[in-house]
Amino acid sequence: MAEKTDNSGLNIEAAEIVVIGGSGGIGSALVRELLERLPSCNLHATFHSSGGDLDHPRLNWHQLDIRETGQIEKFASTFERVDWIVNCAGYLHGSKGGPEKNIRSFDCDFLSENIRINTMPTLLLAKNFSAALKKSASPVLATVSARVGSIEDNRLGGWYSYRISKAALNMALKTLSIEWKHSHPRGCVAALHPGTNDTALSRPFQSGVAPTDLFDPAYTASCFVDLLSRLGPDRSGQFWTWDGKNLPW
């Protein structure tokens, strides 16, 4: 059977792939999908406090606190080459609170935590993995964003901190894509909207979601692998839905 390659000649099936947040709902589904679909890939997945439940000879687990600059620097220094980095880590609610319904609920600490998890890690990954990504024939850096981070698409309001952190993430990715035209001309930077998935992150907010609009993470992961396999320089700097449609920034 012929090896699957993209337009650059990269053997996708044997790619070196890093999945950040690989023990989460979407992240763990993506790890499983990549191992199944790309039978020769070498996969590295990170977890925050508890490791993933999957054991596989081509899967390497790494504990990583994405809020800590030093940990990301140390993690990145262990890689000679990386083809894909997919950041699936995200924060919507936790001990510091949840999405605000109105401005009266706004809290600076909650906004800071959203930015520390939803925005800054992608910039640190781009910075510290730059050399390893440059050695790929077709590097991809993609982060799971959210439609609520689209300024043009914001019609409902609310959720100040989450929206702000995702909008900032989108700006970071768009800006990085412009730099990559010169520094990584064979590469692609992408923001990914996963839709609403049946995960711990979205579970408190699923009551108003139609069953047909609530996705199994395995479905989203399959769509993401389809999309990632088609990304290249001509598609860099865009905001994609799980099914390959463009969203406005």
Task: Go through each PLM region and give its residues.
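N-terminal Rossmann NAD(P)H-binding glycine-rich loop of SDR-like oxidoreductase domains
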Residues: 20-35
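Conserved glycine-rich Rossmann-like NAD(P)H-binding loop of the short-chain dehydrogenase/reductase
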Residues: 35-55
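Conserved Rossmann-fold cofactor-binding substructure of NAD(P)-dependent oxidoreductases
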Residues: 64-81
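Catalytic loop of short-chain dehydrogenase/reductase
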Residues: 91-95, 99-115, 134-183
